[in-house]
Amino acid sequence: MASQGTKRSYEQMETGGERQNTTEIRASVGRMIGGIGRFYIQMCTELKLSDYEGRLIQNSITIERMVLSAFDERRNKYLEEHPSAGKDPKKTGGPIYRRIDGKWIRELILYDKEEISRIWRQANNGEDATAGLTHMMIWHSNLNDATYQRTRALVRTGMDPRMCSLMQGSTLPRRSGAAGAAVKGVGTMVMELIRMIKRGINDRNFWRGENGRRTRIAYERMCNILKGKFQTAAQKAMMDQVRESRNPGNAEIEDLIFLARSALILRGSVAHKSCLPACVYGLAVASGHDFEREGYSLVGIDPFRLLQNSQVFSLIRPNENPAHKSQLVWMACHSAAFEDLRVSSFIRGKRVVPRGQLSTRGVQIASNENMETMDSSTLELRSRYWAIRTRSGGNTNQQRASAGQISVQPTFSVQRNLPFERATIMAAFTGNTEGRTSDMRTEIIRIMESARPEDVSFQGRGVFELSDEKATSPIVPSFDMSNEGSYFFGDNAEEYDN
């Protein structure tokens, strides 16, 4: 599935299209974005939200979650077959925040899923528009990536918390399709596979019978997706071994963890897309922007341009720093949770600080939080420059290792050196090179040892002025090469608990 011959651009994955030319891709992505915008406007009308309330990111998230829940076929079916107390399987809802007499009031709303899906289809020319749904899932996933740490999840599967930069997309639902698979990090795929193998170890029937056959197909497909993310022959060969294993068990788990570690230096190809909150698209559509006619790209200037002239608000808790809240959302909008802070800061034109130094909690407000003390402020989502999003891990000239960047997975295609402590990483590889994958392991370790930290990734690539929409004159930034900029150092973020 993810073999070399079938590489499609993100936009094709995003819109389910086969090979199209750039104009067609831009138009179909534009159609998807326009549909989200029209849906959002309609929902604001239904809920009688004022202009200000419609620009509140928390309201946007509730509306996005409602439509995602309305179209979650498997969960809806499950809810109908296993009725739980106090949950109506046919309804969906969430908190809507309204500004009344200078105070923010939380109102819990409930809608028929039928009704929501009708409004969604109507906004999307009567189609299901799965691409638009996936797009919103990726925005939520990017927001989670920027907000929470996954240390516990990593440790539970036997991985190391230092592998956090490989965990992009770890909260994406399984149903997110090809576009979702493209944005998942190596660690996310490894974690999904390990969970599957562990179930097989504990449950004799997991791989058996008709269900087991389907499980097996899913397993092999996930292996192929992961294989497609690796860029060296040895890593790919090792994935073939894992995929072809008759009865996946601890040996495969070992191999997968080895591969995940190796991805700290031999980075995988992980796609990055700027997915914005629905209210941003709604604002643009409301102001008369025709996305389908103008065309749109998730990896170019368009999202930057959109954020330059959109005003979005957020609720702020009493001791949160609005500038920090803005940084969090900016990172989520550009899928930059795992990007080098030096690069992000340069593009944003403001210093981007590591998560451990942020005085802000997540964007969503829990139902037990006190609304009396809530304030709201404008999110500063503008940038100084724009840059093209990348789908490569930033290894210099493929097939040869370069010092990929530990604890960073590049988002922007911008030249930088990749400072990393090879000793720290290589220490993780002492010991086990026996077994049937020994020659591949030896080869992978050899490639990593020859990696040079002084290599430059994305040679000659730069950022662009916001007036330079055709990306004609790149500005290649020079970074202070000594310090590495991982967002996760000194981390004290909350865990993501589903």
UniProtKB/Swiss-Prot annotation:
Function: Encapsidates the negative strand viral RNA, protecting it from nucleases. The encapsidated genomic RNA is termed the ribonucleoprotein (RNP) and serves as template for transcription and replication. The RNP needs to be localized in the host nucleus to start an infectious cycle, but is too large to diffuse through the nuclear pore complex. NP comprises at least 2 nuclear localization signals that are responsible for the active RNP import into the nucleus through cellular importin alpha/beta pathway.
Post-translational modification: Late in virus-infected cells, may be cleaved from a 56-kDa protein to a 53-kDa protein by a cellular caspase. This cleavage might be a marker for the onset of apoptosis in infected cells or have a specific function in virus host interaction.
HAMAP family: INFV_NCAP
One Pfam match: Flu_NP
Subunit structure: Homomultimerizes to form the nucleocapsid. May bind host exportin-1/XPO1. Binds to viral genomic RNA. Protein-RNA contacts are mediated by a combination of electrostatic interactions between positively charged residues and the phosphate backbone and planar interactions between aromatic side chains and bases.
Motif segment (Bipartite nuclear localization signal): 198-216
Annotated stretches, region: Disordered: 1-23
Protein name per the record: Nucleoprotein
Biological-process GO terms, alphabetical: symbiont entry into host cell; viral penetration into host nucleus
Gene: NP
